[in-house]
Amino acid sequence: MLMRTWIPLVILVVVIVGGFTVHRIRGFFGSENRPSYSDTNLENSKPFNPKHLTYEIFGPPGTVADISYFDVNSEPQRVDGAVLPWSLHITTNDAAVMGNIVAQGNSDSIGCRITVDGKVRAERVSNEVNAYTYCLVKSA
């Protein structure tokens, strides 16, 4: 009878010892109660200084342009048939803002400019037939 029962007994002992070992390891590692660093109290948070972003498209007087830009939420917006010079002022309290503007006009010259808090961060002028230009500020 011992000849047939020794294998199940060894398996039972191995399972018991393995279970005990796993129980001890789980009790030793990861058992501490770590403090939570997240806090839902937003009342004391100070807003960032507002950022003032200005998009400008310029060219010869009377130029008509199609303009695409990112708004304050980085959503694409489009203005068709804008008479130049054209500008848009955006104010946000976000920590960072991305500025992107693209324009194509019906004249041989067109330019764009992005200013952040009064400082020119991107400027470009294009001189070609049906001129196309873009300006990009990755982080402001």
Swiss-Prot record:
Disrupted-gene phenotype: Deletion mutant does not exhibit a low iron growth phenotype, but has attenuated virulence compared to the wild-type strain. Deletion of both mmpS4 and mmpS5 drastically decreases synthesis and secretion of siderophores, and greatly reduces virulence in mice.
Pfam families: Mycobact_memb
Membrane topology term: Single-pass membrane protein
Protein name as catalogued: Siderophore export accessory protein MmpS4
Assembly and oligomerization: Interacts with MmpL4. Can also interact with MmpL5.
Family membership: Belongs to the MmpS family.
Lineage, highest ranks first: Bacteria, Bacillati, Actinomycetota, Actinomycetes, Mycobacteriales
Triggers of expression: Transcriptionally regulated by MmpR5. Repressed by iron and IdeR.
Subcellular location: Cell inner membrane
